[in-house]
């Protein structure tokens, strides 16, 4: 039976809607009363796992799920061994460098050498500043990253931005974009190559559904 790993949070509703368009209904996950983390679709053709977004590629890489939906930001940060299949064209956001609006920094290159940058995306942040040949200390933070510059713990942050409202309300401005992110369809590499459970048919239908939506 096909198993799909779905992310909790903002991508879930659109992920379920997309799967419904190809005949796989996991809408029970949207019921506020449910506590189930694994459910079959209404026709018994597949099942879905509801997991943290960061864990989607782990379940896919280790073969517990043949397909998964996850943000490109997670794939860039984690670099999992999975097959990248389709840009699903929803869940748009961007990975940005931000600083206090009251600071003099208007470009990452304005930041002082060996300054501090707070981020939950440690690998992406390190890779970006390495590409600029600017040595900085990456400070791992996993909640309210905006507090880094506000409290003076860091000169800047690297974080995911959707509307930018949270940053504006906390007196921060974006000074650079590392990359843009959307939801992606990924697959377990061996299952994809061997077409386990007619996986290629499901993928083809999902590709077509995305094209129709665009």
From Swiss-Prot:
- Record GO cellular component, one term: cytoplasm
| Record keywords, A-Z | Amino-acid biosynthesis, ATP-binding, Cytoplasm, Glycosyltransferase, Histidine biosynthesis, Nucleotide-binding, Transferase
EC class: transferase
InterPro entries per the UniProt record, alphabetical: ATP_PRibTrfase_cat, ATP_PRibTrfase_CS, ATP_PRibTrfase_HisG, ATP_PRibTrfase_HisG_short
Q: Where is it located? A: Cytoplasm
Principal place of residence: cytoplasm
Top-rank taxon of the source lineage equals: Bacteria
Q: Pathway membership of this protein? A: Amino-acid biosynthesis; L-histidine biosynthesis; L-histidine from 5-phospho-alpha-D-ribose 1-diphosphate: step 1/9
Keyword ATP-binding assigned to the entry: answer is yes
Listed under catalytic activity are: 1-(5-phospho-beta-D-ribosyl)-ATP + diphosphate = 5-phospho-alpha-D-ribose 1-diphosphate + ATP
One GO MF term on file is:
ATP binding
ATP-binding: present as a keyword of the record?
Answer: yes
What biological-process terms (Gene Ontology) are attached? Answer: L-histidine biosynthetic process
EC number of the protein: 2.4.2.17
A Pfam family that the UniProt record links to this protein: HisG
The domain comment in this protein's record states: Lacks the C-terminal regulatory region which is replaced by HisZ.
Q: What task does this protein carry out?
A: Catalyzes the condensation of ATP and 5-phosphoribose 1-diphosphate to form N'-(5'-phosphoribosyl)-ATP (PR-ATP). Has a crucial role in the pathway because the rate of histidine biosynthesis seems to be controlled primarily by regulation of HisG enzymatic activity.
Q: How does it assemble?
A: Heteromultimer composed of HisG and HisZ subunits.
Per the record, the similarity remark reads: Belongs to the ATP phosphoribosyltransferase family. Short subfamily.
What name does this protein carry? ATP phosphoribosyltransferase
Organism name? Nostoc punctiforme (strain ATCC 29133 / PCC 73102)
Q: Source gene? A: hisG
């Amino acid at each position: 039976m096909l198993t799909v790993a779905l992310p909790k949070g903002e991508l879930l509703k659109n992920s379920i809607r997309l799967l419904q368009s190809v005949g796989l209904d996991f809408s029970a996950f949207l019921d506020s009363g449910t506590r189930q983390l694994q459910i079959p679709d209404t026709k018994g053709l597949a099942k879905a796992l509801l997991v943290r977004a960061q864990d989607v590629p782990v379940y896919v890489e280790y073969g517990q799920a043949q397909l998964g939906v996850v943000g490109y930001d997670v794939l860039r940060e984690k670099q999992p061994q999975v097959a990248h299949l389709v840009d699903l064209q929803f869940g748009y956001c961007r990975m940005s460098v931000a600083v206090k609006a009251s600071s003099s920094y208007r470009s990452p290159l304005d930041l002082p050498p060996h300054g501090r940058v707070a981020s939950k995306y440690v690998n992406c942040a390190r890779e970006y500043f390495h590409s600029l040949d600017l040595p900085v200390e990456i400070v791992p933070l996993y909640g309210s990253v905006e507090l880094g510059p506000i409290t003076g713990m860091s000169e800047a942050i690297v974080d995911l931005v959707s509307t930018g409202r949270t940053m504006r309300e906390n007196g921060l401005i974006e000074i650079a974009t590392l990359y843009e992110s959307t939801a992606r369809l990924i697959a377990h590499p061996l299952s994809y190559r061997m077409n386990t459970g007619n996986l290629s048919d499901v993928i083809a239908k999902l590709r077509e559904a995305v094209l129709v939506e665009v």
